[in-house]
Amino acid sequence: MKRTLYLLALSLSLLAELSAQTPSLHGVVTDPSGALVPAATVQLRGPGGEQHKTTDGSGQYSFPSLRPGKYTVRIAGKGFAIFEKTELDVTAPTVLDVQLQIQTEAQVLNVEADANTTVSSDPDSNGGALVLGQKELATLSDDPDELSQQLQAMAGPGAGPNGAQIYIDGFNGSSLPSKSSIREIRINSNPFSPVYDRPGFGRIEILTKPGMDSLHGQAFVQYNNEDFNSRSPLLEQSTRPPYKQEFFGLNVTGPVKKNKASFSFDAQRRNTTENAFIYATDLSASLVPQTVNQAVLTPLTFTMLSPRLDYALNANNTLTVRYQNTRSSSDNQGVGSFNLSTLGYNATTSENTIQATETSIINTHLVNETRFQFMRSTTGMTGGTNDADISVQGAFTSGGAQVGNSGTRTNEWEGTNTSTFTHGTHTFKWGGRVRGTSLSSTSVANFGGTFTFTGGDGPELDANNDPIAGTSIELDALEVYRRTLLLQQEGLSDAQIRALGGGAYMFSIAAGMPTTSASMTDVGLFVNDDWRVRPNLTLSLGARYEAQTSVGDYGDITPRLGIAWGIDGKGSKAAKTVLRAGAGAFYDRITQATFLQALRYNGVTQQSYVIFNPSFFPNVPTATSLAAGLQPQQLQIMDNSLRSPRNYQANVGVDRQINSFARISVNYIASRGVHLLRSRNINDPVDGVYPFGDSEIRLLNETTGLSRTNQLMVSPNINYKKLFLFGFYSLSYGKDDNEGQPADPYNLRAEWGPSTFADVRHRFVLGTSIPLPLKASISPFIVLQSGTPYNITTGLDPNDDGIFTARPELVTGVTAANCSGANLVYEAKFGCFNVNPPAGAATIERNYGRGPGSATLMLRLSRTWAFGEKRESDPNAGGFGGPPPGGGGGGRGGPGGPGGGGPPPGGAPPGMGFNSGRRYTVTLGVNAMNALNHPNYAAPNGDLTSPFFGISQSLAGGFGPVGGASTYNRKIDFQLRFGF
C-alpha cells in the first residue's frame, strides 16, 4: 500500500514538473508611468504559425502550451507605438512585461484597423461589441446630451426598459464627460462577465484620457440660432420661434512631474434658448373649443468643470483622482404637450463627484484595483403658483405648478475592489462592490389639489345648449368640462349639471409633511475563471451574488457562462471564424424612488385624498376638513415578499473575419424577465364590494411582472485605409406585462402585450467617415427604426380608482355608419370600438397600436488646417495613464479598459481624423441634426375620447433637443476648434 502511494505521489510530482516546464509566455503591458494597458493587441509569431491575443482588464496576456523555439512578439495599443521583440527564446514558462510608448497617429490607425476587423476567442473580443475609437467618435455629437442619446440608440433593446447602463472609468451614475476627454467607448462588450450586475447587451463603457507629459489642449466654440434651423411640422405658426445655443469647451493636459504625474482639465458651458411645444385643446372665454399650438421659451444653462490627476506612486502602483462639478438651470419646466404655460416652474441641478482609483501590480501574475466614488447631487424647483389644477383628460391641463420650494439632496457612494490572477491557461478574477444611497426629498406636489374631468355620456344639446329629449351621446372630457362651466353660469345645481353630462369626475389633494428621507445599500460579489482550454477555445465560468437592503431576497446567486471557439483555428493558426455562446442571470435593483414614494404616501407622512364625483368644483376644500370627514386616500404600499427583478439571458453568435479589413458578427439573443416590478390597486371593488372593507386606493408595488425578448443582431465592421464603417441591424420581438397600471388589477394575464422598448421590430445604426478633397471629411451617422407600440385606452375609469388604463372592445362586423351611440367610437384605422364594454367582453391587447417609423441622419463636415513648427514624435512622451478605468473592455471577465496613453502628440483635435504633426491646428466643422429634415413623429395619442386620438403631438426625438418637445425638426451647428 505504501509503495502504491509512493508511486502515485511520484507520478503526480513528475506530471506537475512536466506541466510546469511546458513552454508558455505571459506578461503585463503598461504605459510609461506604469499604468496598465488593457485591450492591447499581442501578436506572437514562431514555431507553428501566428497567434493573436488581447490584454485583459488588468493589462495581462497569456500564451499557454507553446512549442519550444524562438518567437517574435509585437504589441500595440491605441495611442501607443508598436513594441517588437525578436528572437525571444521560449523553452519554458517565460515572462515578458512590456512598457509601451506614445508614437505617431499612422501607427495608431493601423492598430485600430487590425483590432476592429480581426476575430478572437478572447471573452472581451466579441464581434457584436461596438468599439468606438477617435475616428468613430468623430461621427458623433459633441453635446453630451445628444451623445448620450446616440449611445443609447447604439446599445439597442437589450438594455431593457431603463436604458443602457453607462460606466465612466468603471464608475456608474456620474454625468457624461465631454467628448474631447473620451479616449474610447465600448458598447455590449463581454456580455456575460460576472463583473457587472446588468446584462452586457446594453452596457456602455466610457474610458477617458489620462494626462500627458507635455502640454496639449484644445478649445472650441459652437453656435446655432433659429436662422439655421427648420420648424417642427407640428408647429402652426409661420415664423421660427426664438432659439440660440452657445456652446464652449476647453480641454488641457500636461505634466505635473515628468514621468511621475500629469493632469488634465475639462470645462464646458452651454447657454441654450430652447422651446417647449404645447399641443392641446382648451376653451375660449366664450366656452368655444380652441386649439393651443404654441412654443414656450425654456432657457437653460449648463456648466461643467472636471480636473484629473494621474500619479505614479511607484513602479507598481498608480493613482488616479478625478473631480467633476456640474451645474444647470432651466426655466418653464413642466410645460408642453397637454400642459399649458401656467404649469411652468424653474429648476436647478448641481452635482459634485470625486473618484479615486488605485492599481497595484503585485507581481506578474496578480493585479489588484480599488475604486471609490462619492457623489452629491442637489435639485431644486421654484416658481409658479399653488392654484388648483384642472386636468381635462385628452385635452389640456392648467392651473398652478404646485412646486413651492421643492427639491432633493442625494448622497451616493461606491467602493469596488477587483483582483486578477493569471496561472497557466487560467485567468481568475474576483472582487466586490458596495454602494450606498441616501436622499432627502421635499415635495408639495398636489398640495393645491387637482380636479379631473373625463369623458362620459349625456343628452345631445341643440344650438341653444338645451337638451334634446330622448337622446344620449358619447361625450369627450372637453365637452364634459364645457358643459360644467356653461351650466354653472346658468345657475344649475351639481346634480342637475351631472344629469346633463357635466361635473368633475375626481378631486385629489395631498397634505402633510413635505420632507421625506430614505436610504439604501446594495452589495455585489463575483468570481470568474477564463480558461484557455486550447489556443482556439476559451471557457468562461463565473458567478455573482447580489443583495440590497429593504428587499428580503438575500439568496441572489447567479451563474455566468461563456464559450468562444475558433472553429477554423488549428494549433498556432489564428481563427477567422469564432463561435460564441453564453448564458447568465442578471439581477436588477428596486430603485430608491420606489421606496421613497411608499414612505411619502403611506397615509402618515403625507395624505393623498381622492374624492369621486365632487360637488364643490371649483372650490378647494381644506385637508383638515377632508381628514375630519374620513375621506378615502390613495396609499402606496410595498409588498412584504419583494424579490429582486431578474433577467435570464442567453446568446449564440458567430464572428467572421471576411478579409484583412472587414468583419461581420451575427448574434441571436434571448431574454426572459421574471419578478419585474409592477403596481396595482389591490382594493378594487369586486361586484361592488371592497376587499379591505373601505374605499381606500391601495397601490401595491410587487415583483410579479414578466417579459420575453428575442433579438437577432448583425454587426459589420470595415476599416479600409481612411474609410471605416460600424453599426448594426437588429430584428427584435418582445412582450411584457408590467408597463404601467393594469386595466384589470385582478387579471394580469390580460396585460401580456408588445413591449414599448423591445418590440421595435427593426433598428439600423450606421456610422462612417468619408475623406473628401482638400483635406476635408464628411461623417454620416444614421439611425432607422420601425414604429413603437402604443396603448389604446378608453380614457375612462370603470374601476373608480383614478387609474385611466381601461381598454376598449373592438366590435367586429360594424361599419362606420352603424358605429354610433353612447359607447361606440369609430376609428378608420382600427374599426368600431366600444369604450364601455360589458363585463366579460374581450378587450384589445395592451399596446395594440403601432406608431410610425423614424429615419434620422446626423451629418458632420469638417476641414482642418495645421500650422506652426513641425513636432517630432517623442518616444518618451508617454501619458500617465493611471489605473485602467474599470468598466472598459471587460476583458477576460474584468472591468478594466484602456487606461494609458491619450492622444498622440501633435495637437490634432481628437475625432477629426487628421494629424499633421504641426504644433497648432484649427478645425472648422458644420453639424446637422436630422440633416434631411425628415419629420419623425412620436407615437400617436391613444385616448379614444381625446380629440387628438391617432395624432402625434410631438416629434419622436432623435438626439438631444431636436425632436421630442422641441419646436425644431432640423438643427445646424457651426463649430470652430483650436488644438495645440
For the regions a protein language model found, what residue spans apply to each?
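Periplasm-facing N-terminal accessory domains of Gram-negative outer-membrane beta-barrel systems
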Residues: 4-7, 14-121, 125, 175
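Periplasmic N-terminal accessory/gating domains of Gram-negative outer-membrane beta-barrel systems
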Residues: 81-101, 105-210, 216, 225-236, ...
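Transmembrane beta-barrel strands of outer-membrane/channel proteins
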Residues: 113, 219-225, 265-269, 321-325, ...
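Hydrophobic, lipid-facing positions within transmembrane beta-strands of outer-membrane proteins
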Residues: 200-202, 246-250, 303-307, 350-356, ...
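Transmembrane beta-barrel wall of Gram-negative outer-membrane proteins
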Residues: 216, 241-329, 346-374, 559
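A surface-exposed, glycine/aromatic-enriched loop/edge motif typical of exported proteins
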Residues: 271, 278-290, 362, 366-395, ...
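Short, solvent-exposed micro-motifs at the edges of structured domains
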Residues: 536, 550, 572, 633, ...
